[in-house]
């Protein structure tokens, strides 16, 4: 039987729980409607047959966080030719960011939403990935880990000078997923994943939202001895990252 896999990635740069904000509040968004404003709760027509959410249980959350933080720590410690990061926080899970990600995921359309901000995070970022395959027995955990690694692998094409100033424009292979992953003003993340079918083809679509996005002409992270500016100490599990208690301001330096 013929087997094939197609994977696509996309990243964003800036730019229905009752316990969450009014997402139709125009003060949340500068660039268009919020993805969760008056959004349908059912799956979209693009979701093919048998669409369902992958359960973001403790195992899946930990897998995504562990993979992200392992790779962030590599950059924080100066691997792959990048400068060390003075204050790279450990990413922790945020249920609201994950909740908002579900509104994009349930459309099954591989495209960024225009706005995914929260009251706390006014510059939320986003990474997307989708895969289509037939003849394989991939599981959600396999795909989530693979997506994250592929995002990170963009470091091979990312000029080191971008660390100090994210460019207005970039030509060449994608680098935005990688820069989103290692942004030192991102300290929270939340993801949603959908599994569905189109005939014999099986698809997984992953949406991860982050507390901060790539800001044009601003640093991706601050150079310095690894962890030297952490205010709560370093994470013993992920050397070079600040402890999980480290909270940073997910804001533009321009205010």
Swiss-Prot record:
Give the top-rank taxon of the lineage listed in the UniProt record for this protein: Eukaryota
Q: Which Gene3D superfamilies match?
A: CAP
Instruction: Name the phenotypic consequences of knocking out this gene.
Output: (Microbial infection) RNAi-mediated knockdown results in reduced enhancement of dengue and Zika virus infections in human dendritic cells and macrophages after the treatment with salivary gland extracts. Lower viremia and better survival in mice bitten by mosquitoes transmitting Zika virus. No significant effects on Zika virus load in the mosquito salivary glands.
The stated induction of this gene product is: (Microbial infection) Infection with dengue virus or Zika virus does not affect expression.
Chief place where the protein resides: secreted
| Domain SCP stretches | 65-210
GO cellular component annotations of the record: extracellular region; host cell endosome; host cell mitochondrion
Signal peptide boundaries? 1-21
Q: Which residues are glycosylated?
A: 146, 209
What keywords does the record list, in alphabetical order? Glycoprotein, Host endosome, Host mitochondrion, Secreted, Signal
Q: Which CDD domains match?
A: CAP_euk (cd05380)
Q: Report further notes.
A: Patients with dengue virus or Zika virus infections during the acute or early convalescence phase have higher levels of IgG serum antibodies against the protein.
Q: Which PANTHER family match?
A: CYSTEINE-RICH SECRETORY PROTEIN-RELATED
Q: Which family does it belong to?
A: Belongs to the CRISP family.
What is annotated about its quaternary structure and interactions?
Answer: Interacts with human LRPPRC; the interaction interrupts association between BECN1 and LRPPRC. Interacts with human CD4. (Microbial infection) Interacts with Zika virus envelope protein E and Zika virus-like particles; the interaction does not affect Zika virus replication in human endothelial cells and keratinocytes.
Q: What is this protein called?
A: Venom allergen-1
The record lists the organism as Aedes aegypti (Yellowfever mosquito)
């Amino acid at each position: 039987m013929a087997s094939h896999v197609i994977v696509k990635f996309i990243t964003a740069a800036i730019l229905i729980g009752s316990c969450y904000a009014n997402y139709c509040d125009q003060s949340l968004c500068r660039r268009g409607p919020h993805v969760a404003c008056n959004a349908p709760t059912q799956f979209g027509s693009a979701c093919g047959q048998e669409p369902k959410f992958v359960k973001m249980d403790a195992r899946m959350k930990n897998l995504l966080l562990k993979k992200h933080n392992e790779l962030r720590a590599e950059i924080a410690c100066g691997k792959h030719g990048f400068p060390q990061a003075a204050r790279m926080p450990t990413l922790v899970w945020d249920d609201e960011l994950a909740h908002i990600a579900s509104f994009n995921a349930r459309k099954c359309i591989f495209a960024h939403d225009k706005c995914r901000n929260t009251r706390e995070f006014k510059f939320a970022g986003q990474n997307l990935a989708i895969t289509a395959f037939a003849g394989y027995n991939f599981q959600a955990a396999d795909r989530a880990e693979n997506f994250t690694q592929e995002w990170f692998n963009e470091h091979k094409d990312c000029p080191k000078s971008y660390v100090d100033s994210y460019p207005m424009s970039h030509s060449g292979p994608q680098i935005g997923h990688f820069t989103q992953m290692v942004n030192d003003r991102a300290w929270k993340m939340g993801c949603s994943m959908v599994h569905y079918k189109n005939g014999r083809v099986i698809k997984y679509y992953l949406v991860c939202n982050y507390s901060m996005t790539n800001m044009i002409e601003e640093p991706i992270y601050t150079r310095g001895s690894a962890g030297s500016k952490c205010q709560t100490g370093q994470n013993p599990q992920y050397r070079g990252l600040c402890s999980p208690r480290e909270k940073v301001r997910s804001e533009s330096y321009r205010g």
